[in-house]
Amino acid sequence: MLSPLALALSSNAAHADFRVCNATQSLVGVAIGYRAKSGWVTEGWWHVDPSTCKTLIEGALSSRYYYLYAEDAERGGRWDGPVNMCIAEKEFKISGVQDCFARGFQRAGFQEYDTGEQASWMVQLTDEPTTAGGNAGNATGTQ
C-alpha cells in the first residue's frame, strides 16, 4: 500500500483549492468524493504526472470532509482507505455511494481527510510505506 502525506500550506497561499501532488515516479489516477447539497458525489479521474500537482477543486472548500482514492497507473499500487464509494473505469461523476455494483459502477475504499475550517488543502502521494492502521495523510489549509 502506498502512502499519502498531507502537507501544510502557508497562510499566505495565493488561492484556495484542494490539490493532490504526486511525489512518485509514476503516473497516478485520482478520484475524489465529497458531500454536495444534493448528496454524495464521487468524481474522477485526474491524471497526475510524476512530480507534479493537480487541482481537484478550485476555490474555497465548501465541505469539511473530502475523500480520496488513487491508483498508480504504471505499477498497480493504490492509495485507499476504509470509506466505500463508487468509481468507474473511465472519467466519471457519480451521485450517491450506495448500490455501486447494481448501478453499473465499481466500489473502492477512499481515505477521509478532515479539512476543518481550512480554505485550502493539499495531499501528497508518496511511495513511503504506510503506518499501522492505514495510509498516512497530512493535510493543511489556509483561511
Regions found by a protein language model. Give the residues of each.
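Short, Lys/Arg- and Gly-enriched loop/turn segments at beta-strand edges
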Residues: 62-68
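Intrinsically disordered, low-complexity segments enriched in small/polar residues
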Residues: 12-21, 25-29, 35-55, 59, ...
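Bacterial N-terminal signal peptides
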Residues: 1-8
